[in-house]
């Protein structure tokens, strides 16, 4: 990353430094740098963004973060994101739908909503994604998670830990406690 007057100018490769004949501590022609920025930074930012979305769906927030990590300035980032949206490479509504569909059987609604909100996905798109992908029975999911986390024979001793685990996953206490108690009741009925 090249810094001019202690501010990030953008990412430069070794070949760019040779091409521009840059030397640490020496003054540089601002016009030459501005022209270089126009010629290369926008194309490189687009290439990096497309490489990021090549293998998996990304949201606008992910692309912005990736380009910021690579030291691109806000103008380059905004232009790149707008082009990606224009060509439908980035669509937060589609991202929300894909995310909900792929996580709905393993995570609670609350956990999915929190993850999408952290990526700056609008509440409207999150709700639409849940409408497109109806929630399975949460009780079944909680029962499966309890059985996966702890065998029924050990559940009595680890009850509080299992409940805390499921509460952290975003499931409501009443549902979790009912499921744990049902498993314990079934276990004692068998014995």
Indicate residue ranges for each PLM-predicted region.
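An alpha-helical, amphipathic repeat domain used for nucleic-acid recognition
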Residues: 1-191
